């Protein structure tokens, strides 16, 4: 077990004021908004301060360290009593932002920069809440602990209550000369550019969590949540793992077959159109579809749309009758459902 006094760099007989000054110095140095790599150290410093600045909890800790507790004493209860009452004060609030993502980025991943307004550590007072040249004093109401304890009589006995100090709002300090930039809050609203890393396979309705990029708080910042909406693409449609597109071809190419190049989301792609292709035939190209979050990849489904000639001159009409002297007569066809009905709804 690490020594709480050692974490703050103070002696075991340090006064509350010395503990507070040591904490404020370390908090300015290790705050995640200023030094993101020191988040764990900052959390440890904050935990140590909140226990040692509370006379009752400090006494319990000192007794345990000196061996004054029975063997069934659990030190984690001491820490838990702190976490349960002040975790909300320790952490900044979360933020939520909505972004529109193009289909290619949603399928293959990428990054996107968004602008947000969030609370950041004040750049004038560095979170101390006091004007430069001044320092905070210990709050008289809570003696610097940030919490006020009381006793309530009940039929079951006396209950000890613990509430956030209303005078210092849980900070344990009295600010006589509040910072003019942040009005004594220690943080202020400011615009920020945040780069969102989008994993492959994102779909509309999915939420991305970015830890410690929310509002600044008394200790750790909150998290940033990003709600994703995938924009419609003018040519491609995603359905599960598969991508669909429609390819217009001439009657000649449908009858004789051909080879064409199309610009897919994955780059230029050569497509072979078989001879005697029918309208709404589907050419399926494996592993050229959408990527999923679990790493699978679907197919690219190319739906053929055969374009008939809008006009026939007498020469072409005579030629067609010569090629097909006995075409099949029109007749009713059985109604179909399922796949082709779905295609009709999607592409007509």
Curated annotation (Swiss-Prot):
Answer yes or no on keyword Amino-acid biosynthesis: no
Where's the J domain?
Answer: 3-65
* Positions bound to Zn(2+) 1: 122, 125, 179, 182
**Top-level taxon:** Bacteria
Q: Its principal location?
A: cytoplasm
Subcellular localization(s) per the UniProt record = Cytoplasm
Name which cysteines form disulfide bonds. none
SUPFAM superfamilies, A to Z:
Chaperone J-domain, DnaJ/Hsp40 cysteine-rich domain, HSP40/DnaJ peptide-binding domain
Which cofactors, by name? Zn(2+)
Q: Which GO terms describe its molecular function?
A: ATP binding; heat shock protein binding; unfolded protein binding; zinc ion binding
Q: Enumerate the CXXCXGXG motif repeat regions by residue range.
A: 122-129, 139-146, 165-172, 179-186
GO BP term, pick one: protein refolding
Query: What InterPro entries does the database record attribute to this sequence?
Result: DnaJ, DnaJ_C, DnaJ_domain, DnaJ_domain_CS, HSP40/DnaJ_pept-bd, HSP_DnaJ_Cys-rich_dom, HSP_DnaJ_Cys-rich_dom_sf, J_dom_sf
Residues in CR-type zinc fingers: 109-191
The residues listed in the UniProt record as binding Zn(2+) 2, with positions renumbered to this chain, are 139, 142, 165, 168
The record's annotation in Pfam families points to: DnaJ, DnaJ_C, DnaJ_CXXCXGXG
Keyword DNA-binding: yes or no? no
Q: What are the protein's UniProt keywords?
A: Chaperone, Cytoplasm, DNA replication, Metal-binding, Repeat, Stress response, Zinc, Zinc-finger
Give the similarity note: Belongs to the DnaJ family.
Query: Domain remarks in the entry?
Result: The J domain is necessary and sufficient to stimulate DnaK ATPase activity. Zinc center 1 plays an important role in the autonomous, DnaK-independent chaperone activity of DnaJ. Zinc center 2 is essential for interaction with DnaK and for DnaJ activity.
Q: How does it assemble?
A: Homodimer.
Tell me, what does this protein do in biology? Participates actively in the response to hyperosmotic and heat shock by preventing the aggregation of stress-denatured proteins and by disaggregating proteins, also in an autonomous, DnaK-independent fashion. Unfolded proteins bind initially to DnaJ; upon interaction with the DnaJ-bound protein, DnaK hydrolyzes its bound ATP, resulting in the formation of a stable complex. GrpE releases ADP from DnaK; ATP binding to DnaK triggers the release of the substrate protein, thus completing the reaction cycle.
What is the protein name for this chain?
Chaperone protein DnaJ
Origin organism is: Tropheryma whipplei (strain Twist) (Whipple's bacillus)
Q: What is the lineage of its organism?
A: Bacteria, Bacillati, Actinomycetota, Actinomycetes, Micrococcales
Gene from which the chain derives: dnaJ
């Amino acid at each position: 077990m690490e020594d709480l006094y050692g974490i703050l760099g103070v002696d075991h007989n340090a006064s509350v004021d010395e503990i507070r000054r040591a904490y404020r110095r370390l908090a300015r140095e290790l705050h995640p908004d200023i030094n993101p790599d020191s988040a764990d150290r900052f959390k440890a410093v904050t935990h140590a301060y909140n226990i040692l600045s509370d006379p009752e909890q400090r006494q319990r800790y000192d007794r345990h360290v000196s061996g004054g507790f029975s063997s069934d004493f659990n030190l984690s209860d001491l820490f838990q009593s702190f976490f349960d009452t002040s975790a909300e004060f320790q952490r900044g609030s979360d933020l939520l932002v909505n972004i529109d993502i193009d289909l290619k980025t949603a399928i293959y991943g990428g990054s996107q920069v968004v602008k947000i307004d969030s609370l950041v550590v004040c750049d004038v007072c560095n979170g101390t809440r006091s004007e430069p040249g001044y320092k905070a004093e210990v709050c008289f109401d809570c003696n610097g602990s940030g919490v006020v304890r009381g006793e309530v009589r009940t039929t079951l006995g006396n209950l000890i209550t613990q509430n956030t100090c209303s005078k210092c709002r849980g900070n344990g300090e009295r600010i006589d000369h509040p910072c003019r930039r942040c009005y004594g809050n220690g943080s202020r609203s400011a615009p920020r550019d945040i780069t969102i890393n989008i994993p492959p396979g994102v779909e509309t309705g999915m939420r991305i969590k970015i830890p410690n990029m929310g509002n600044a708080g008394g200790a750790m910042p909150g998290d940033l949540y990003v709600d994703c909406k995938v924009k419609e693409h003018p040519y491609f449609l995603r359905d599960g793992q598969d991508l669909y597109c429609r390819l217009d071809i001439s009657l000649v190419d449908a009858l004789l077959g051909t080879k064409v190049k199309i610009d897919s989301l994955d780059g230029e792609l050569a497509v072979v159109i078989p001879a005697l292709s029918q309208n709404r035939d589907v050419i399926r190209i494996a592993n050229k579809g959408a990527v999923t979050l679990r790493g699978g990849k679907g197919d690219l489904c190319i739906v053929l749309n055969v374009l008939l000639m809008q006009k026939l001159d007498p020469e072409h009409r005579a030629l067609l009758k010569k090629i097909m002297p006995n075409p099949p007569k029109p007749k009713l066809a059985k109604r179909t459902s399922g796949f082709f009905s779905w295609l009709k709804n999607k592409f007509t």
